[in-house]
UniProtKB/Swiss-Prot annotation:
Binding-site residues, GTP: 17-24, 81-85, 135-138
UniProt domain tr-type G: residue ranges: 8-282
Database matches in HAMAP family: EF_G_EF_2_B
Primary localisation category: cytoplasm
Source organism phylogeny: Bacteria, Bacillati, Bacillota, Clostridia, Peptostreptococcales
Keywords: Cytoplasm, Elongation factor, GTP-binding, Nucleotide-binding, Protein biosynthesis
Function in brief: Catalyzes the GTP-dependent ribosomal translocation step during translation elongation. During this step, the ribosome changes from the pre-translocational (PRE) to the post-translocational (POST) state as the newly formed A-site-bound peptidyl-tRNA and P-site-bound deacylated tRNA move to the P and E sites, respectively. Catalyzes the coordinated movement of the two tRNA molecules, the mRNA and conformational changes in the ribosome.
InterPro entries per record: EF-G-like_DII, EFG_II, EFG_III, EFG_III/V, EFG_IV, EFG_V, EFG_V-like, G_TR_CS
Top-rank taxon: Bacteria
GO biological process: ribosome disassembly
Protein name: Elongation factor G
């Protein structure tokens, strides 16, 4: 079947925001106006179509990014709703990887909140074009202009308003359209009845001022337009729109519009803006990949005639069809029932059925084209970040890198019968979520689950019960400490065993060098003259990596070291891979002992918003938790924002303490930032308790 909607008229967008900025409600309204939903649901009543996991309905927050397809004015819009809670940044990260553009939703009262910054930085990393929707213009304390200022100062982008609000809080009735230079007034509760009229007299001067900024921003995207503008000529509406689109697609600035999704104001205009200014798959650069044989770089363009290539960006267990793999098609066409190659794993896969998702209902399609987002049934070996491609034109697209978990807890089923069920369930959940890990502690035999924060693990335990009917007891959260060295050392190890017959002989000399934080592990072979034969070098590397799994201080994973193998010797008869593996392992452990090993702990970036009266208490409490106060800023509503870095080990139970210290008036958010050395006195206690 030929393509129904052209690539130019396809939009793949994400909706991203801080928790509670109104993101899911905004998506709901978009689907309502695009005709996908009959009745509008309210998120805080637990009825939203996008929030379809049980826990999401209860908590009123979005956890898994649901991909939805809808149509607006002859355009196909694929929307990915992403979670705003910091524990779920992995969902945001992988959504951004497959999107062409994004709508950032801000609360007109809260402005740019910490998670907005985190998500914005993630979008910067992938150079995703963005537009901003300032939501909740109807609530007490809404301030459009303050939010614009925060977008500029905190996110480092140039916000260009396309609209100005008419009134605010209770009196928010409509918007001024700065392109058409008219006013749009909402006449009914559903936002269906809109009246276009003249700009109110008291806003004309302000509208002219902002229109001038808008026209200048549009003109700066094109030399011809700039000349016309500088010569004092008027730009046409078409030229302004084309300029804004160009500037948005090239990430030169961020167009801003406003409304109130809950009150159904501004959502159709948001859809119009998505169609007008967000990029189509043709506007984004070709995706790069490598050929597995010779690692040559190749490009795939958004074109149905190119060989098929796609990226699997999410795996989900579905109660009706089993495993669902969400993927983005970058080039070519895919038919249901056809065979593809999972080039990341080197395995052929058969596509069973192809589904286009609408929150949690689905429509079966026979073919998907370049630029489409869909879900496939029947992919057995595919996991998040894998490339699917035409077996005759093999390519591996750049995969996604996910952060390591920072917190872990022990779990055990309440019944003996639950043990096997729990093992299977945890494996399935780990398949879905690359930042969730599960393993068995070899010393205690306990099952350990590890993730990005307390809420993350709570949701996992909750899902064990709801989806897999496994009741589990959960231990106390533990911090994921790491180890590293602080001093470069040279060590040698000669491993020789003679016990009748063939012996074991491996001799290595290595340098162990500390790396800057986050650099990871590097191994360099600097052996010259064949003092260690080539075939034994990988064994030395494997031995070192094995030893890194359990450091010398408390048995924690070792990170951020470079090891240079520069010399050694071998024996014609007695040397073996095993001997060199053991020699590498022993040499590394010796290097750790001599290299002044230190314990590292995760530090969280914490932002506390508190009334001024409690500032002293809150700061004193953060200091007592070994926090480092980075800065403070006053908000217009009498609140103070405190930014700090605090060790994760000191943050357990913080929510309860903060509530009691501020009579429930302060809020906080935190996310993992970096690892740092633990003070010696505390490190001793930690290692002694192991």
């Amino acid at each position: 079947m030929p393509r129904q909607i052209s690539l130019e008229k396809t939009r793949n967008i994400g909706i991203m925001a801080h928790i509670d900025a109104g993101k899911t409600t905004t998506t709901e309204r978009i689907l309502f106006y695009a005709g996908k939903i009959r009745k509008v649901a309210e998120t805080h009543e637990g009825g939203a179509q996008m929030d379809w996991m049980e826990q999401e309905k209860e908590r009123g927050i979005t956890i898994t990014s649901a991909a939805t397809t809808c149509q607006w004015k002859e355009h196909k819009v694929n929307i990915i709703d992403t979670p705003g809670h910091v524990d779920f940044t992995v969902e945001v990260e992988r959504s951004l990887r497959v999107l062409d553009g994004s709508v950032a939703v801000f609360c007109a009262k809260g402005g740019v909140q910490p998670q907005s910054e985190t998500v914005w930085r993630q979008a910067d990393k992938y150079r995703v074009p963005r537009m901003a929707f300032i939501n909740k213009m109807d609530i007490l304390g809404a301030d459009f202009y303050q939010t614009i200022g925060m977008i500029k100062d905190r996110l480092g982008t140039n916000p260009v308003p396309l609209q100005l609000p008419i009134g605010k809080e209770d009196t928010f009735v409509g918007i001024v359209d700065l392109i058409k230079m008219n006013a749009v007034i909402y006449k009914d509760d559903l936002g269906q009845d809109m009246e276009t009229t003249e700009i109110p007299e008291d806003m004309k001067e302000l509208a002219r001022e902002y229109r001038e900024k808008l026209v200048e921003a549009a003109a700066e995207t094109d030399e011809e337009l700039m000349m016309k503008y500088l010569e004092g000529e008027e730009l046409t509406e078409e030229e302004i729109v084309a300029g804004i689109r160009r500037g948005t697609v090239n990430v030169q600035f961020t167009p801003v519009i406003c409304g109130s999704s809950y009150k159904n104001k501004g959502v159709q205009l948001l859809l119009d803006a998505v169609v007008a200014y967000m990029p189509s798959p043709l506007d984004i650069p070709a995706i790069k990949g490598i050929t597995p044989d010779d690692e040559e770089e190749v490009e795939r363009h958004s074109d149905d005639n190119e060989p098929f290539s796609a990226l699997a960006f999410k795996i989900m267990a579905d109660p009706y069809v089993g495993k669902l793999a969400f993927f983005r098609v970058y080039s070519g066409v895919l038919d249901a029932g056809s065979h593809v190659l999972n080039s990341t794993k080197g395995k052929r896969e058969r596509i069973g059925r192809i589904l286009q998702m609408h929150a949690n209902t689905r429509e079966e399609v026979s073919t998907v084209y370049a630029g489409d987002i869909a879900a496939a049934v029947g992919l057995k070996d595919t996991t998040t970040g894998d490339t699917l491609c035409d077996p005759d034109h093999v390519v591996i697209l750049e995969s996604m890198v996910f952060p390591e978990p920072v917190i872990h807890v022990a779990v055990e089923p309440k019944t003996k019968a639950g043990q096997e069920k729990m093992g299977i369930a945890l494996q399935k959940l780990a398949e879905e979520d690359p930042t969730f890990k599960t393993y068995t502690d070899e010393e205690t035999g306990q099952t350990i689950i590890a993730g990005m924060g307390e809420l993350h693990l709570e949701i996992i335990v909750d899902r064990l019960l709801r989806e897999f009917k496994v009741e589990a007891n959960v231990g106390k959260p533990q911090v994921a400490y790491k180890e590293t060295i602080t001093q470069a050392v040279e060590v040698e190890c000669k491993y020789a065993r003679q016990s009748g017959g063939r012996g074991q002989y491996g001799h290595v000399k290595i340098r162990v060098i500390p790396q800057e934080p986050g650099k990871g592990y590097e191994f360099a072979n600097q052996v010259v003259g064949g003092t260690i034969p080539k075939e034994y070098i990988p064994a030395v590397d494997a031995g070192i990596q094995g030893a890194m799994q359990a450091g010398v201080l408390g048995g924690y994973e070792v990170v951020d070291v470079r090891v240079e193998l520069y010399d050694g010797s071998y024996h014609d008869v007695d040397s073996s891979e095993m001997a060199f593996k053991i020699a590498g392992s022993m040499a590394f452990k010796d290097g750790m002992r001599k290299g002044k090993a230190v314990l590292l702990e995760p530090y969280m970036k914490v932002e506390v918003t508190t009334p001024e009266d409690y500032m002293g208490e809150v700061i004193g409490d953060l200091n007592s938790r070994r926090g480092k106060i980075e800065g403070m800023e006053a908000r217009s509503n009498g609140m103070q924002v405190i930014n700090a870095y605090v060790p994760l080990s000191e943050m357990f139970g913080y929510a309860t303490d903060l509530r009691s210290k501020t009579q429930g008036r302060a809020t906080y958010s935190m996310h993992f930032d970096h690892y740092e050395a633990v003070p010696a006195s505390i490190a001793e206690k930690i290692t002694a308790s192991k």
